[in-house]
Structures are given as structure tokens and as C-alpha cells.
Amino acid sequence: MIISAASDYRAAAQRILPPFLFHYMDGGAYSEYTLRRNVEDLSEVALRQRILKNMSDLSLETTLFNEKLSMPVALGPVGLCGMYARRGEVQAAKAADAHGIPFTLSTVSVCPIEEVAPAIKRPMWFQLYVLRDRGFMRNALERAKAAGCSTLVFTVDMPTPGARYRDAHSGMSGPNAAMRRYLQAVTHPQWAWDVGLNGRPHDLGNISAYLGKPTGLEDYIGWLANNFDPSISWKDLEWIRDFWDGPMVIKGILDPEDARDAVRFGADGIVVSNHGGRQLDGVLSSARALPAIADAVKGDIAILADSGIRNGLDVVRMIALGADTVLLGRAFLYALATAGQAGVANLLNLIEKEMKVAMTLTGAKSISEITQDSLVQVLGKELPAALAPMAKGNAA
């Protein structure tokens, strides 16, 4: 099979993975309107082509939280990576490390902090959910600090799980789910051998270490469902800010006022995100939400963005809309499921090449030169010829 884009990895992953895993990764909340808009809205962002500029010294390097990145991309937190490839978190982290970008370990990873951190040279990032069990949160933070994690990504858009219709149909949940998953596994031999048999243990490593006993997929579904905390507020985050002495990023911002609250709280960064369309269907795509948020807090806090990014062109679009760096989710997971570390490494190379093409043809020699001036049209609205700063109304 010829691999030239993330879409090729998606097609390959669908053949390799049991349906319950593919659709858990690929699906979104409710009718998946926001999931689709994340991708479609980015595709409507038209760039301004410029020609006859000397682009021989083009550079993708950037700095974030005093870390040098080879390009403004990080691998975002994705749960259960180790169910998509053998010890998947370790493989993805190694690919990111080799490319000179951060890897973010999810709270609900298969491989625990202590397995992933020693496998790479640069400090990894760690993602934490808002959970009722504050003992687990403190334990996870202590272990992340001990392992040398540099940045905490605190996910706040999951006070309750989203309703994901695909999960019930695919076997992740619903009637006879365990039996359906077993039957799917035995009919997908490549996955069954590589991950099902040789990728064990299939624990939720970070949670198992805390509970002192093995955990599995049923524990993942049940433990998380019982531990999400809808009562959380900014005040509840103060002890985390006091405890964590490194950069702290608030993930799940879609409104400018919430972004301003993050600045007032003292966060070092935000992630403009709708959780990949997996939480509340019908909310703004990240591409639509980003310009107004950037207008409100750009320069006061680092702005990261995710949801809908599939290639290097999308990275350039997000930066032009106001992001400093982007997080990849599904795109790298498709590659991981298809070819492990090598797949993720190849995807990152593709994204880098695509970024270089986009920057060359828009006349941006550096990441700092990718601005709103790089845009001609945003979400169906043509910008003035002078390309004046985008009006706030354009973001809605």
C-alpha cells in the first residue's frame, strides 16, 4: 500500500484493527457534526500565495516553554495507545523524540509513566484529567515529577463522558460487548498477534500502579465513568498549580472568556480544543474558535490547538489563525496502528515536508512569519485586500 498522507494510514488502520478499537479512535460524540466540522472548517481556510521570494533559509524551528521544537507540533494525549500497537506509547514517544518534538502521555495510557519516560531523551509531557479521586491525581503528579516530565497538560473539558453512539455499535460498549470484542480480535490476526498476544500487559498502567492491581478495558470504562468530577472549578485547580512547578497547560478551551480566566489563573498555556469532537457535539470547531481566542489572549499565554489537523497544511492554517503550536491526535494514532514507531516517524516527516511546501508558497521563512497576513479567506469569508486584522465576528 502506498502511504502519502494521514488518510492512507487511516484506511490501513481500519483494515488492521478490530472494529471496536478503530471506531473508538475514529468516532466522535452523538451524530459527529463537530468531528466533521473540525476537518472541514480547516479546509476552508484559504492561504495567500506569494511568489519570487528567496526561501532558501526557511526554518520550522520554534521554542515553547523553553523547549526547542524542530517544528510547532507535539503529539497530544491519546488514551489506550498501547491497544493500537505493541507498547504503543513507547513507540510513539520514541518517534516524537527522534523528530525533536514533545510526546504527551495520557493518564489512561497502557504503558505507565515509568516505562515511557526512560525510553526517550527529552522530557515528555503528562496529561491529567479532573477526577474525584484526588489521591490518584496527587499520586500521578508525584510520579510524573519523579520521572522528569516537563509540562502538565490538564484536561478540563471532560467533567462527564461524552455520548458516543459508535461505541455501542462497535463493541466498545453496549450489549455483549466483551464477547463482541473477542470475536473481532480473533478475526484480525495481525492485531491479535502484535498487540493482543505480544503487547501484554493490557493494563491501564498509571491506574494499575495506584490501585495496586491489574486493570483492563472494563476497568477503564467503569473507573473513569465513576471518577469524572462535574463539580470542578478554577479554585479546585489551585493546589495543582501550587504542586506543579513546571509549565501548566489547560486543555479544552473554546471561549475567549475561559481563555482570559486561564491567564488570570496563572496557566502557562491553553489548548483550543473540543476533544476531537468526542465530547459535546455541535460546539465550534477549533478552527472557528481559535481566532477570537487569539485576539483575546495572544501574547499573554501560549496558545496550542488541536482537533481536525491531518497534515502540514493544517498546521500552517492553525498557526495563521493564532496558534503557537498544535497537538496531533488521530493523525498519529492512525500511523501508529498501521506501522508503529516507523509509521509515526514517517507521518511526522510528511507533515514537515507539507509545512515546508506551504510556507515556501506563502512566503513565510519562519514560524513567526505565519500570521493572519498569510490568509486570504477564513471559513468562507474573504478578507480585505489589505488583509487587516481579522474582526472578532469572523471567528463565530
Curated annotation (Swiss-Prot):
Primary location: membrane
Q: What is its EC number?
A: 1.1.-.-
Binding locations of substrate: 24, 129, 164, 278
Give a GO cellular-component term. Answer: plasma membrane
Q: Where in the cell is it found?
A: Cell inner membrane
What's its catalytic activity? (S)-lactate + A = pyruvate + AH2
Keywords of the record: Cell inner membrane, Cell membrane, Flavoprotein, FMN, Membrane, Oxidoreductase
Q: Which Gene3D superfamilies match?
A: Aldolase class I (3.20.20.70)
Top-rank EC class of the record's enzyme:
oxidoreductase
What positions does the entry give for FMN binding? 106, 127, 155, 251, 306-330
- Cofactor(s) of this protein: FMN
Q: Which residues form the active site?
A: 275 (proton acceptor)
CDD domains recorded: alpha_hydroxyacid_oxid_FMN
Fetch the InterPro entries from UniProt.
Aldolase_TIM, Alpha-hydoxy_acid_DH_FMN, FMN-dep_DH, FMN_HAD, FMN_hydac_DH_AS, LldD
Coiled-coil portions: none
GO molecular function (one): L-lactate dehydrogenase activity
Disulfide-bonded cysteines: none
The UniProt entry lists membrane topology as: Peripheral membrane protein
> Which GO terms are recorded in the biological process aspect for this UniProt protein?
aerobic respiration; lactate metabolic process
Q: Which family does it belong to?
A: Belongs to the FMN-dependent alpha-hydroxy acid dehydrogenase family.
Q: What does this protein do?
A: Catalyzes the conversion of L-lactate to pyruvate. Is coupled to the respiratory chain.
Per its UniProt record, what PANTHER family does this chain match?
L-LACTATE DEHYDROGENASE, S -2-HYDROXY-ACID OXIDASE-RELATED
Q: Which NCBIfam families match?
A: L_lactate_LldD, PRK11197.1
HAMAP family given for it? Answer: L_lact_dehydr
Q: What is this protein called?
A: L-lactate dehydrogenase
Q: Gene name on record? A: lldD
